Amino acid sequence: MKKERLEQASAFGKDRVKKKKNTDTSSNLIPVPKGATKEKKRVGRGPGSKVGKTAGRGSKGQYARNTVRRGFEGGQMPIHRRLPKRGFTSKFHKEFYPVNLRDIEKSGLTGNIDAKIMVQSKILDKETTLFKILGTGEIKKAIHVIADGFSQSAKEKIEKAGGSIKLRAELKLATSETKK
């Protein structure tokens, strides 16, 4: 049977012979129960298909021609236009990535900790990411952290352990002033 198909393929060209579905993957080895998959309905392909001409949409009218757009309420003033505009997005708003003391303790960081070290220990993705140290967890060793922000509880816990904190913005200002 297979040889005959190959001979036919060489005689008529490979595009003339129907290809069998790939059945060598593990998911295809298990037979699919009858009725588990439903074939897509081909509509609008002539009267012999039983869903030709109007393609199951009834005859004429708004719904036969196209769909109604999202949020359309039949001509009534839609809710997104009935409700007033409110607020704005500040262009000065900064989004801080939260870093808990628990994360620093878990990664085993000690000594001076800044963005570069946090990227190396995979706490942060990039050095340029703004991050804030939060106080969830305990810190046992003295650490000296340079970050963009600190919560009150994080400040207390770091200083209690004998560490220190510095804001990255203050360091940038100090270095820019010394360059002048």
Curated annotation (Swiss-Prot):
GO terms for cellular component: cytosolic large ribosomal subunit. The keyword NAD does not apply. Residues 1-62 are annotated as: Disordered. GO terms for molecular function: rRNA binding; structural constituent of ribosome. Pfam families: Ribosomal_L27A. Belongs to the universal ribosomal protein uL15 family. PANTHER family: 50S RIBOSOMAL PROTEIN L15, LARGE RIBOSOMAL SUBUNIT PROTEIN UL15M. NCBIfam families: rplO_bact. This is Large ribosomal subunit protein uL15.
